[in-house]
Amino acid sequence: WDNKSNNYLEVHTNKMSMLEELGVLAALCMLNEHACNKTLQVFVDNNGAVFAYAKGYSRKCRLLNTIISAIKIVSHSLGINVVVTDIMRRSDEGSRVTDDLSKANKSTLSGFMGTSNRVLLIPQTIWDWMKHPTMDDYSLGHRIIAEINSCGGTRAVAPYTPKFIG
């Protein structure tokens, strides 16, 4: 994001928490076929992200609220119970690989992935939102579900609408 622009000034208060939750949303979308009617536990090394997700909102970052809302809508629509759990930074192989990837170091990835993996794609809707993030965009989850359904990639049900959205 453009650091010169004041449009994202609010993001900087909880930017890392928002990015961690964006990773949760991406994982949820990529694993939708495998996680339907199951629990998806995602480990993050950011306490703020864990607490904000547990509360269901953030008082500091409205972009984080958008992502949390999208996770709730997508997970309920797909019948997936998402659990966001805290993990100490670089405390196991998975967290070390993830930390390396966040620094564009791919050297540890191949040993972790093995040979039987396939590429999973993040929905274009998320990429589009990342290019032009909007605060309080409570339709993001619905747009993601519409894209997943249009690809025929899952057994999605009608989009879930939380009571507070109306």
Model-inferred region functions:
Residues 1-22, 48-58:
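A short, polar/acidic, helix/strand-boundary loop motif
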Residues 3-7, 14, 32, 37, ...:
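Detector for Asparagine
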Residues 135-166:
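RNase H-like DDE catalytic core and adjacent DNA/metal-binding regions
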